[in-house]
Amino acid sequence: MPTQTLTLDWHKFHKMTEARAAFPRHACIYVQADSQGRAKRIGKASKGLEARYRGGTGYALDAAMDGSANLVFVAPVPASVCAAVEEELIWWHREVFVYNNVGRKQAPSRRLELRHGGDAPRFEKAAV
């Protein structure tokens, strides 16, 4: 059973470096999405995106995304729940998040009810 409800206030970016500039030191969850906004991979940055993608790493992601129209979505979260939010999102969408290797086989020990606000990515379930 979820023990806490949290609304994620999503922000959309066309480059990882833009997202990093907006959330340099704030704990956040980020989504790498396709050009239609469909979530493909979830990540957490418990110390902000500057620490997670410092220096040339952000630019390397921008270069890899160049011409694809792929998107990055970021939602600030309290650092105390950053890992739990990432785990919950991966668990709920484990069938389609093939780029997330951890968290797809066992439900998180700390369960959260997540709601999505702002400019949210599209979270889709796999066709059954």
How would you describe each model-predicted region?
Residues 1-40, 45-128:
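Boundary/linker segments flanking structured domains
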